[in-house]
Structure formats: structure tokens, C-alpha cells
Amino acid sequence: KVRIGKPISVKDQLEYNDINSFYEYLRKKTYMLANPFVKTPQNILSTQNLKITIPPKKIASQKSTQGFIKEVISLRKKGKRLLESKNYEVFFASAREIPNLLHEIGRLREITFRDIGEGTNKAIDIDKFDKYYHHLFLWDRQSKALVGAYRMGLGKDIYKKYGISGFYIQTLFRLEPELHGMMERTIEMGRAFIIKEYQQKPMPLFLLWKGIVHITLRYPEYKYLMGGVSISNQFSDFSKSLMIEFMKSHYYDPYIAQYIQPKKEFKVKLKDADKDFVFDAAKADMQKFDKVIDEIEPGALRIPVLIKKYVKQNARLVAFNVDPKFNNAVDGLMYIKVSDIPESTVNPVMEEFQAELERKATEENEK
């Protein structure tokens, strides 16, 4: 194979003061282009060798839009709408309140995840956890379409009824007893997606995150958010290894991590020279590191959006695991202390939340 790297901007060139250091940069950068194509020895665990053999099933048919609209109207009446903005509405509901919408969530999950080399390969991505977890979803009332969703597990309720095995993350990681108390005060997040037609628009992910902050205000007994972020199997094992090492170097929490064991750990394989070169080029800057991944990966892949979003919310990384039931995507487990979420994220939502409380109080007094 012959591969040509991306142009090096004048700005990047000017970071080097002498020809020798610039030459060394060019030499290492050139050799780096080959790494995604290096074959992994058979005796080393590689996610490329763990492909699911079951062929993908045909995606389930969509149910009637009228059924979706009926459930949305019902949720509005019950006060389950967290916020609205222009043509968008964000709702938080239990599975029993949205049987038709939940079917659509599962359908769109599978379509969206398959597009990026993930997914269950089933006709619909619905499992036993969906029945007792809550669902945060974004509805476009103009198009009468579901745009995206998060699955949200309220830890206190889950632990009381099912114990630690009631959490989805326990299927991928072993959580030691020292963390059980923390999980009772944790909202578990997962299965996040935005459908392809809306992924380039800035509002959907922003509004879903506003919805998450609304939930933390409505349920103040929860002090943590926790969930997995997926690194698709479309990435080379080399890039996966780089991402994991970069995250561990800058966003790792060793205290919490000691109580979490991955059930199928991804084995990082990196040469020290490659690791040093990438880390020197990126420093601790996520944007620079994202650019490095873009240059290395032949498929124009970037660091998953959710990883970048969580890091901006002061998330900490605690473990990585290969998920064989999800097309061998690598799941990074991260958590956020609610008190650590930046004020720039919380304050606008706090104002909306306070205004909503005042509006409801006024309505009650007028009755």
C-alpha cells in the first residue's frame, strides 16, 4: 500500500525552530501512517479477531406515527416535558408510558449504531434493561419525528429492586462492593444516539444535555452520572490504543478505577516511540489529539463526539472493555460528579428550572 498523509499547515511548521527537529517530526509522522495497517499477531487479543458471526438482521418496521404523537401528547399532559426550543421538545419518561416510542428508539438505535460499525445486528436494539430504565428523548414536533435519545437508569430504584446486577454496566464491568453505595446515588446513562439526518446540527446533542442537567435538578439525591462511551470497531487497534492511553494520561481516576474490573479488557499495544510522538504533538489538548487521530485513521474518523462532550463536562475515566454483543466496540466507562459540571452548563438550565417551578406555583395558587 502507498499512503499519503494530510498537508502540514504553515502554523504547525512554525512550531519547530530548527531543521533537525522538524525533520524528526516529519520522519515520525510518515512512519505513523503505516500503523493502522499493521497486522496484529494471532496470539494478541485484537477486537478485529472478535467479529460477530451472526449476519445483521433486517431492521424492524416503523410503527404508526400517530401512535408516537398520541404518546407525546400524553407526556405533555403529565408534565413529562423537560424543556422545549423552537421545533424541539425534550421528554423524560418510563418505558410503560411510551411503548410505541420505545420501539422506535430501539429501531433508530440499531440503524444509527450500524452506520458507525457498532450495533447488535438484531432487528431492534431493545433489551431487558429498557423495561425498567427511563428514557430521555428529543422530539421534533415540526417533522413529527424522534431525533435522538439517552437511556437513563435511576440508581436508587434499580439497586433497591435488582441489586448491583440490575445495572447495565455490570454486564461489561465488575463493580466491587466498595462502589455499591455510590451506584445508589448514580444515574446511569447509555445507548445515546442522534439520527443521521440531525447529526450535523448543533442543537440536538446540546438539548439532550440540557435535558440531562434538568434531570439532575429534579432528582437532587443523585450525585453522579455514569455511563459508557463507545469507540467503534471501525477504528484500527492502533488508534484505539492511542485513545485509551491519552484518556488514561489526562482524565483517569485511579481511586474509583481500582474497584472496577473490565470483563473483556482491551489490550493496549503501543511502542513507546509512537506514544511519545503522539503525546508530544497533542500535549494535553483534546482538539490537537483529535487532529492526530484524523491524520492517522484512513477512514477520516475522529474521536467519538460523546468522549469530547463528557470531557468538557469534567468527566473522569475509570475503565475500558470490549463489548462482544455490540460489534466488539470498545466501551470507555466514565463518570461525572454532578457538582463538577461546569457552571456554563448548569446555570442556564437552573434559570429555566426555577422559572418552571415559579410558573407551576402560580398555577397552583390560582386554582
Regions found by a protein language model. Name each.
Residues 120-123, 157-316, 321-331:
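Acyl-donor binding region in acyl/amide transferases
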Residues 1-61, 275-281:
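Non-catalytic C-terminal accessory region of glycerolipid acyltransferases
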Residues 15-28, 32, 208-209, 302-308, ...:
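C-terminal/domain-terminus segments
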Residues 331, 355-366:
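Long, compositionally biased intrinsically disordered regions
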Residues 57-96:
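Conserved N-terminal entry element of GNAT/NAT acetyltransferase domains
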Residues 6-8, 94, 191-196:
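Short, histidine-centered active-site or binding-site loop motifs used for metal coordination
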Residues 82-125, 131-135, 139-142, 147-148:
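Short amphipathic alpha-helix that is part of the acyltransferase structural core
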Residues 150-156:
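Short beta->alpha transition motifs characteristic of CBS
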